[in-house]
Amino acid sequence: MRLHHLLLAVLFLVLSAGSGFTQRVRNPQSCRWNMGVCIPFLCRVGMRQIGTCFGPRVPCCRR
């Protein structure tokens, strides 16, 4: 019975951890929380866009 509870807890942990990666970054606070930085117009070389900060013209970029 203890093994059943352990497996259930592991399953819950795996499923809850993956749910955050499917949501897009849409504001400056969530950009910083996802290790990103708000840069006007375009992301710098070596960085990729992971969302937006204030609108479509300000992307959230991360290395």
Curated annotation (Swiss-Prot):
This is Beta-defensin 4. Neutrophilic granules. GO terms for cellular component: extracellular space. It is found in: Secreted. SUPFAM superfamilies: Defensin-like. Disulfide bonds join 31-60, 38-53, 43-61. Pfam families: Defensin_beta. The gene is DEFB4. It comes from Bos taurus. The lineage of its organism: Eukaryota, Metazoa, Chordata, Craniata, Vertebrata. Residues 1-22 form the signal peptide. Has bactericidal activity. Active against E.coli ML35 and S.aureus 502A. PANTHER family: BETA-DEFENSIN, DEFENSIN BETA 4A.
